[in-house]
């Protein structure tokens, strides 16, 4: 089971890093596309939240 969790964490980590880069890129382009700040930030927030929840799940499984 932990192998499948580790695979999910890897996917979620990649998704979170992409969301982080999207937010970073948006910040560098400001004030262009300022209207997208909340949308892009929400995606990053959700991606990192999902990653942290899955890491906690793995930690409980291993303990």
Per-range role (PLM):
Residues 1-30:
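N-terminal acidic leader/helix
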Residues 1-3, 60-63:
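Short intrinsically disordered terminal tails
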Residues 25-62:
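Short, charge-rich amphipathic interface segments used for partner binding and complex assembly
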């Amino acid at each position: 089971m932990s192998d499948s969790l580790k695979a999910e964490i890897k996917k979620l980590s990649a998704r979170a890093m992409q969301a982080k880069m999207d937010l970073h890129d948006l910040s560098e382009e400001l004030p262009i596309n300022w209207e997208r700040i909340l949308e892009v930030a929400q995606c990053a927030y959700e991606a990192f939240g999902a990653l942290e929840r899955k890491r906690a799940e793995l930690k409980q499984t291993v303990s």
